[in-house]
A protein has these predicted regions:
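Polar/charged, Q/E/K-enriched amphipathic alpha-helical segments with strong coiled-coil propensity
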Residues: 2, 59, 64-66, 84-156, ...
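Amphipathic alpha-helical segments and their boundaries
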Residues: 2-52, 85-103, 124-131, 158-165
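Selective recognition of signaling/oligomerization transmembrane alpha-helices
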Residues: 7-13, 42, 151-201
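N-terminal extracytoplasmic segments of bacterial inner-membrane proteins
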Residues: 16-22, 32-78, 98-119, 134, ...
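Juxtamembrane transmembrane-helix termini
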Residues: 25-35, 58, 185-188, 192
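The DHp (HisKA) dimerization/phosphotransfer helix of two-component histidine kinases
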Residues: 49, 56, 75, 82, ...
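Generic recognition of well-ordered alpha-helical segments
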Residues: 52, 78, 137, 192, ...
Length: 203
């Protein structure tokens, strides 16, 4: 009987070790997804700040404002490249690569537009207007890609949280079931042992 009762603490320790292992792996994954989601939000904010700096250049045209635009977009490009290294899903990696290419194209067009505006050369007004239109289209495309990336990352994070909740629920149910079956088995064996002992005394 003593040996059978001793199974309980061993079973409890075994189940707790499994629970701790699964929880550690699951929570680490959720924390990683949450961190990536936060970085994706930062990229969206960086894009907004970069585009605002373009409008500021248009309102107050000078070299400092131009350099600020270039600095903001180059920083955004570097941050996207770093962010891409943390991703594993091909479509999100592709979104990052396409965003970096768009930024490169955007800056080339912006530099040309900025030079025309800084020189106040009316002879190149048509080219200037064309550059503005191209920048608007590229900016919108870039915005869509970063927002799509951000949305997908948020969905992945939410799915990870749901998966963790489901795993813990299933684990709790299995734990209760194991203890119930184990206790029933041990109780029957104890009762059987006691009956055998009783029969032995009466014989």
């Amino acid at each position: 009987i003593g040996k059978k009762i001793f199974i309980f603490p061993l079973l409890f320790m075994f189940v707790m070790i499994i629970c701790a292992f699964l929880y550690h792996n699951s929570i680490s994954y959720v924390e990683n997804r949450t961190s990536i989601s936060e970085n994706a939000n930062v990229l969206a904010k960086d894009l907004l700040n970069s585009r605002i700096s373009v409008y500021q250049f248009m309102l107050e045209t000078n070299i400092d404002k131009r350099d600020k635009v270039i600095e903001n977009f180059e920083t955004l490009s570097k941050n996207i490249a770093l962010f891409k290294n943390r991703l594993h899903i091909p479509k999100n990696i592709l979104l990052c690569e396409e965003s970096i290419e768009l930024i490169s194209t955007y800056l080339k067009i912006f530099n040309n537009m900025a030079n025309i505006k800084l020189k106040e050369n009316n002879e190149n007004l048509k080219e200037y207007n064309q550059d503005i239109l191209k920048m608007a289209n590229i900016g919108k495309d870039l915005e869509n890609k970063i927002f799509a990336l951000n949305e997908d990352i948020v969905n992945i994070r939410n799915d990870a949280i749901k998966a963790l909740t489901t795993q813990l629920t299933i684990l709790g149910f299995i734990t209760i079931l194991i203890f119930f079956l184990a206790s029933s088995f041990i109780s029957r064996n104890i009762a059987k042992s006691l009956n055998n002992f009783k029969d032995g005394l009466q014989s």
